[in-house]
Amino acid sequence: MFIKIGIQTAIQKNIDEIYLTHFTEENDYLVTLIEDYGFEKIADKKNGEYIFVKRLFPKKDKTYLPGEISKKFYPCFYDSREVSKFIVPIRPGYHSKLFTDYKRQTKLSEFMEEFIVEGNTIKKAYLCHSKTKGLKEGDILLFYRSNDVRELTSLGVVEKVYENVTEPNQIVSYVGKRSVYSRKEIEEMVNKPTKVILFKWHLHFENPLKYKNLLNYQILKGPPQAIIKISHDKYLKIKGEVKINDRYTFN
C-alpha cells in the first residue's frame, strides 16, 4: 500500500523516479515485493543499508515485453495492437470493494486504521464464470461498473489467468491477499468452473465513459453480461474519451 501511495505522489509531483532505503535480511520478503514493482538495487552502504530506485518510464532505446512494462515501470503499460483489450463487467458491491479509492483520494492515515486492505492494493484478483478465452499476461482490462452508474471506470493489466478452477483452496492459494471475496463467496462460486484473473490496477479514468456513449460509439451492442473482447480501434476511441495520459502508455 505504501508503494501505491508513493507512486501516486510521484505522479502528482511529476517525478520520474522514486527511491527507498532498506536494511536487508536473508530471504527478505520486502526486497522480493519491491522488485516486483520495478525497484532495483543501485547501491549499498557500509552499514548494510541498501538503496533501491524505481524508474517510472522505460528507456526509449530498449525493447520490453508487454508484461515487463507493467512490472518494471508501473504505472506505465503497453497498449499496442499486440495486446488484447477486454471490457470486464463488475457489480457495484464488488466494484466498491475491489476499487476502494475510486473517485476519492486515500489518505496516508487510513493505512493505519481498519480498512479494506485488498481493495486498496495495486495487485488484485477478479473471479467470474465468463467463457471468454484468450486472456494472457499484458492484456488490458477495462472495468465496467454495471447496474447503478453503468460506466467504464478503471484499467488493469493481466498478470496471470487460471481457467476452470473448481476447488476453493486452489483459488485461495492463487489470489493470496488480493481477493475481496469471502471464503463463503468463493465456495459458492466454485459450484461452477471459475476463471481467476490476477491483475495490476493501473488507473481510474478521469472521464468515465457512460453506457449510452458506449452504445453511441458502437463499442457495445447492449449491457455487458460477461467479459467482452474489443478491437484495438474501439480501445483507441475509449482511450481518447476517458482521457488516458499518453505519457504512461507505450506502443
Mark where each language-model region is.
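A cross-taxa feature marking solvent-exposed loop/turn segments within ectodomains of secreted
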Residues: 13, 149-151
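Short gly/pro-enriched beta-turn/loop segments at secondary-structure junctions
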Residues: 81-83, 136-138, 151
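Short coil-to-beta transition motif at edge beta-strands of beta-rich domains
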Residues: 131-145
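Contiguous surface segments at macromolecular interaction interfaces
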Residues: 9, 15-16, 20-21, 28-106, ...
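Short, flexible beta-strand-to-coil junctions
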Residues: 24, 145-149, 203
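Conserved acetyl-CoA pyrophosphate-binding loop and the N-cap/start of the following alpha-helix
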Residues: 2-7
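Short alpha-helix capping/helix-loop boundary micro-motifs
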Residues: 122-131
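Short beta-strand-centered aromatic/proline hotspots
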Residues: 151-162
